Curated annotation (Swiss-Prot):
GO CC terms: plasma membrane
Chief localisation class: membrane
InterPro entries the UniProt entry points to: UPF0114 (IPR005134), UPF0114_bac (IPR020761)
Lineage: Bacteria, Pseudomonadati, Pseudomonadota, Gammaproteobacteria, Enterobacterales
Lineage top rank: taxon: Bacteria
NCBIfam families named among the record's database cross-references: HI0507
Similarity remark: Belongs to the UPF0114 family.
Protein's name in the database: UPF0114 protein ESA_00283
One Pfam family hit: UPF0114
Lipid bilayer topology: Multi-pass membrane protein
Membrane-traversing stretches: 15-35, 53-73, 136-156
Record localization: Cell membrane
Amino acid sequence: MERFIENAMYASRWLLAPVYFGLSLALLALTVKFFQEIIHVLPNILTIAEADLILLLLSLVDMTLVGGLLVMVMFSGYENFVSQLDIHEGKEKLSWLGKMDASSLKNKVAASIVAISSIHLLRVFMDAKNVPDNKLMWYVIIHLTFVLSAFVMGYLDKISRSKGY
């Protein structure tokens, strides 16, 4: 009975495979939205205001960071929790594949969230005159919470590695 339960639990990790595949569909949706934004601005590129162009570029950078986050979670999560990716050496292989454990993935995700939050905060500040002060304050508080959380997670990870946990 114990062996059956352990084998069933171990096999259940494959339930995550469609979830990681679903992230690739989310990446496809993000890519469509990215190019939709570019196609939307191209006819107006000569008449668009500089501030509006910068806001659009920040949105594109934001989407790119989210896309990178999706790829990182998709591949390293799959490798850490489901199965090793079987990519032949002759093919192009990401240098970090197989080297990122759950702890480093957590830290990279936290750093990505801070970067995404920074871009969003910059976009908000570019339009600060149209945003109420209390809303600006909450954006900053939320961003600082992300920064502090990422710092604390990194610090705790450093402590646990030095103590051999």
